[in-house]
């Protein structure tokens, strides 16, 4: 891969990371709201939009190859991409439900695989990607 492609891939990852981070922050807030329904007296929630954005952003980086940034990273890269696929399936499953409650999202937020992907993304950004 050329240096220009490396920079483009880093930009793609960082753009996705920004969307993922915003979506995850919304999930944390929603999980703490105690909603039994997506719509309440304040109007409809944006939970489905947030889940879609999260899943779409993960899809955009589902084929990244970190070996362009570091040697001996293949095991980490494989594990990260496997976890990413699991998180995508969780988000898709939630979107298929007729109602998404705060408790469902709170439990989703607590899943180790969700935290693993989030932490791995921050690690990738700080350690492997070219400096901003």
Name each region found by the language model:
Residues 39-45, 78, 104-112:
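Short, charged, amphipathic alpha-helical segments
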Residues 87-132:
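Amphipathic alpha-helical binding modules
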Residues 36-67:
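Short, well-structured hydrophobic secondary-structure segments
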Residues 56-78, 97, 101:
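Short, solvent-exposed, charged loop/turn and helix-capping segments
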Residues 79-89:
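Short, well-ordered alpha-helical segments
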Residues 2-48, 120:
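Short terminal alpha-helical segments
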Residues 8-11, 15-22, 49, 56, ...:
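Short, well-structured alpha-helical interface segments that form or flank functional binding sites
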Residues 29-39, 66-69, 96-103, 126:
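Short, flexible helix-adjacent loops and helix caps
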